[in-house]
Every structure is written in structure tokens, then in C-alpha cells.
């Protein structure tokens, strides 16, 4: 096998596919990248029996062939090469890389032992790539890190008509984002549970300014994503995800609206002097919200901001990290807190003006911390 390709093109493709290499592979060959050269193009792929990544790049192919190369070292080599065409050759078990005056020789890995790459399922529809990336950032903050509850370490994706919904929860907060789905078949409904790492990778590396194609599993356990020359597949997670939609209250008689940046900065400042996870108290009254943390001999801090309150005065407390996580992913100038009463979760949504309707495409439900009685 022999081909020549620009350094930047090769480095980008190798770097992207190498991101999917397993940390603890069940077999040494899974540390490798499968490189296939054919007429005018080169395919670079990784697979760990659960997640596959594949990118096709244009190249000047002099001799077709297939080889398996240690992935991480190849990625490091490609990043270090000078900005010039790279000549890549593979002969039996020896791989040679030449770029200007730089020469590398690596031992190849046995291609025969590498698992067969899964095919991308049939495309079911598309979403706007940038919108999907934003949605992933907004919901992944609520993904659980508790490996004893594996279902909650995933992100649920639901398809209904022309709407895609992403959901995640760690039992203390819940994030839900709806985006426009462009289906091939508008009658198809689906609900799948994906590894959060897979969804995060798709959001950060496949979702550019164009469309992201998604292949839902008509049968079996494989979902696929495609954008440009990149393809990735992943097996689904098993189990029944809890019906977390039911946790959103139907009616919320109390609403408070605060400027997002002001509240985020105040929460950050007050958290500086509060002990770890000391609750932030928010006391909403007509025209203002008083924020404070700490009591008695503890370090204390407080700040008062302008707020628009509809309904009765209310005092609540939240885990400062959970509140800050939510505020960071809102792209609106204002956030709205919707309450039933103080002991119940609040629904946080965004809006562009203090007296406007809220944008319910993204909602962040946050459990309160119980306040002391004295």
C-alpha cells in the first residue's frame, strides 16, 4: 500500500478517529487504526466492538491495500510532522511514514484479527448540526456520573414527528431540550438511550455548520451519525429509562425572571466564600432577589439583584454547582424560575426580555436543598 496526502488532512482524520480508541481495550488490535487505500481515497477507522468511527479522505493512491497501525502513536506522529505532503507506505508488517526530512517506521498489527466494521444503518433524518451541538451541551450537564446507576449515565433521544428531544438526569436535576427533526418518514417514532460520551463526541466533532444525518435503528441495537466525510456508529444502552418528563409540573403559579449573567456572576462570587456545596439561598420578593450563603460562624456572602416576580414571595436553596451549571448553558439574556412551592423542584427556562414569554425548547428542572427550620 502506498499513498500521498497533505499533512493537515491526514492529521485531522487520524486525530478524529483516534479519539474513539478505547482506554482499556479487550484486545491489543483494538488500539489500532484500520487504514484502507483504494482508488483516490483513504479510509481511516477505529472500532472497539461498541463504537466505530470512520473518515474518508482524498489521497493520491499509488498502491491499494489495508493495514492496521497503532493509533495513538500515529496520531502523535501526524501532529508532529512538518506542513508538507506525507508519503505513507505499508509492506507486509512494516509501515513507513515520510514527510520532508522526517522518517518513521512502525510495526504493523495483524489486520486479520481486527473485527469487521459495522455498516452505517439507513439514514432516518437530519438535524441542524450547530443546534444539535448546543442541545448536547445543555443536557449533558445533568448526566449522572454514578456508575452504580448505569441508565442515568446515558442520554435519552426521542423522535416524534418533526421534533427530536434530548433528556438527561442524575436524580437531582433534569435537562430537556427539543430541536427540529427533519425525518425521511414523518410517521416514525423512536426512543433510544445512548452513552453520554458518544453523544458528546458527536456533538463536538460531527456537528458543524451543516446538517447532521442520523440513522435510527429500525432493528437491532446500532445507531449511526454522519456529517461530511465522517461516520460513527454506537450500540444502544439497555434498560428502561425512567419517565422523567412526568416530573415537569403542569402548573407553576410563581414565576421569577432574572438577568442570566447577573445571577451567574453573583452565584460565582458568593460561592467563593461558602464551604463546598453550601447551599445558595435565593429569596425572591417583588422587584428583587437576595442571594446568600453561610450562617453563624461560617464565612458568609450576600448580594441583591433586580428580579421580576409574579406570584407570592418565595425562598429556595440550591446546590451552587448545579445552579451554576444550568446558568452557563442558557443562551438567553434572562432566565425564568417557575415554582409550584418552595419544597418542590423549580423549572428554569430562558427568555429574551424580562416580560416576554419563556423559551420552552430548553428546560432545566432543579431539585431544591431543604432549608433549616431555624
Region locations from a protein language model:
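Structural preference for solvent-exposed beta-strand-turn elements
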Residues: 1-374
